[in-house]
From Swiss-Prot:
Substrate binds at W39, M40, N41, D42, Q60, F102, S103, R170, D171, E223, W311. This is Invertase 2. GO terms for biological process: fructan catabolic process; inulin catabolic process; raffinose catabolic process; sucrose catabolic process. It comes from Saccharomyces cerevisiae (strain ATCC 204508 / S288c) (Baker's yeast). Its EC number is 3.2.1.26. CDD domains: GH32_Inu-like.
């Protein structure tokens, strides 16, 4: 009887634990693109239709399941404002069920160098896709052209246009290099750790010019390269070239990530200024960054978007009937005066989120010109929140304060669920480490609790953007969108993107600001705005 009673008690305890966790969350992001259904990964073929003022996003897509698998297609979405996206029919399909239309890029062939177009097609809509055809036997570079502005495509009859007798040769990114009047392609010899650079007159015949190889973090393989001219923040008329390389697996924090190199390009060779591998985004969920072929100049010349997930756990993310979202589109510039530490300035990629919201609520300012103490924490009511909101926090550390290294001297923000405040995000800054931290593990979603690769806690080093009157100032902008968080520190000098998951319907209901020490933190500004 004792054994029977014990087993009954144990079963009841297990049932209680199971009931306290949920398997899925159906809260879809509002301002981050997600497919209606199915699986999505890398962004592809980004371009701007100048005739119709329309932005095009293509992406790796499996409409038949919520995990990666073949056949793999190019999904398609369009936008008028880079924030609100409309799903379109599949754009490019593979020829076999065991194959895939893998990642690639789009160009606008204004001058009809390919010969695919006649005068009935507006030069601004002469788009050609350059993509990898993947089969179990090989990876080869194909091209397809569109006669209707990027909605349907015809495959070039003489494909492939580039082959290397390899199963690891992919992700062509093509742009027009004006000085030489040639098309330039970067493509990854993934497991040779090479980014090969090719040139072409017509998009059909390609000449190998050089290779950028064995640089930075190697990981298991290189993927999704890109080469783009990026203007400097200090003087937009001046620019440098940036080489982007994705790594998967083998990222320093686990799984996948993006790195970049700053240098020069002469039409055939890219040369990095130094041997530093720089990190594009310090979060766990930002991969396969691709930049737009062309842009609306009012937004800037260097725009990009990334897949907001990580290959370590992307197949297990608890959303349904879709998996994965894209990051916000970001405007990139180069800060040539980035203060890496008090003695060194570096060239650093700066990111600014592009967010066009017509129905956002007003900014509500909750703290201004205030010294934070343990007794005067701030509580912000978000009971009408949809689960998507922005916040801005400008704070300073009193450098005259002496704090023991054994004290966790933090400023913390607690974003709590409305229906269940035991689910929350905690983020903030700790003085001794000079780092901003995030804890995304306080959830009752089973995936968050049980998946060992979904790192609950992470941090990123922060340096002050200014110091005056014994105060060192820091700035952070954050966007929380149902299950994805983007953080921009000091106007985008450092960025961190991470997903998080709470029980379905448990929208953010409050924000609390606390500290563990008195009179250390000065709050210059803290404000919140709901996105509806």
């Amino acid at each position: 009887m004792l054994l029977q009673a014990f087993l009954f008690l144990l079963a009841g305890f297990a049932a209680k634990i199971s009931a306290s966790m949920t398997n899925e969350t159906s809260d879809r992001p509002l301002v981050h693109f997600t497919p209606n259904k199915g699986w999505m990964n890398d962004p592809n073929g980004l371009w701007y239709d100048e005739k119709d003022a329309k932005w095009h996003l293509y992406f790796q897509y499996n409409p038949n399941d919520t995990v990666w698998g073949t056949p793999l297609f190019w999904g398609h979405a369009t936008s008028d404002d880079l924030t609100n996206w409309e799903d379109q029919p599949i754009a490019i399909a593979p020829k076999r069920n065991d194959s895939g239309a893998f990642s690639g890029s789009m160009v606008v062939d204004y001058n009809n160098t390919s010969g695919f177009f006649n005068d009935t097609i507006d030069p601004r809509q002469r788009c050609v896709a350059i993509w990898t055809y993947n089969t179990p036997e090989s990876e080869e570079q194909y091209i397809s052209y569109s006669l209707d502005g990027g909605y349907t495509f015809t495959e070039y009859q003489k494909n492939p246009v580039l082959a290397a007798n390899s199963t690891q040769f992919r992700d062509p990114k093509v742009f027009w290099y004006e000085p030489s009047q040639k098309w330039i392609m970067t493509a990854a010899k993934s497991q040779d750790y090479k980014i090969e650079i090719y040139s072409s007159d017509d998009l059909k015949s390609w000449k190998l010019e050089s290779a950028f190889a064995n640089e930075g973090f190697l990981g298991y393989q290189y993927e999704c390269p890109g080469l783009i001219e990026v203007p400097t923040e200090q003087d937009p008329s001046k620019s440098y070239w940036v080489m982007f390389i994705s790594i998967n697996p083998g990222a320093p924090a686990g799984g996948s990530f993006n790195q970049y190199f700053v240098g020069s390009f002469n039409g055939t060779h890219f040369e990095a200024f130094d041997n530093q591998s720089r990190v594009v985004d310090f979060g766990k969920d930002y991969y396969a960054l691709q930049t737009f072929f062309n842009t609306d100049p009012t937004y800037g010349s260097a725009l990009g978007i990334a897949w907001a997930s990580n290959w370590e756990y992307s197949a297990f993310v608890p959303t349904n009937p879709w998996r994965s979202s894209m990051s916000l589109v970001r405007k990139f510039s180069l800060n040539t005066e980035y203060q890496a530490n008090p003695e060194t300035e570096l060239i650093n990629l700066k990111a600014e989120p592009i967010l066009n919201i017509s129905n956002a609520g007003p900014w509500s300012r909750f703290a201004t010109n205030t010294t934070l103490t343990k007794a005067n924490s701030y509580n912000v009511d978000l009971s009408n929140s949809t689960g998507t909101l922005e916040f801005e926090l400008v704070y300073a550390v009193n450098t005259t304060q002496t704090i023991s290294k054994s004290v966790f001297a933090d400023l913390s923000l607690w974003f709590k669920g409305l229906e269940d405040p035991e689910e929350y995000l905690r983020m903030g800054f700790e003085v001794s480490a000079s780092s901003f931290f995030l804890d995304r593990g306080n959830s009752k979603v089973k995936f968050v609790k049980e998946n060992p690769y979904f790192t609950n806690r992470m941090s990123v080093n922060n340096q002050p953007f200014k110091s005056e009157n014994d105060l060192s100032y820091y700035k952070v902008y954050g966007l929380l969108d149902q299950n994805i968080l983007e953080l921009y520190f000091n106007d985008g000098d450092v960025v961190s993107t991470n997903t998080y998951f709470m029980t379905t319907g448990n929208a953010l209901g409050s924000v609390n600001m606390t500290t563990g020490v008195d009179n250390l933190f000065y709050i210059d500004k803290f404000q919140v705005r709901e996105v509806k």
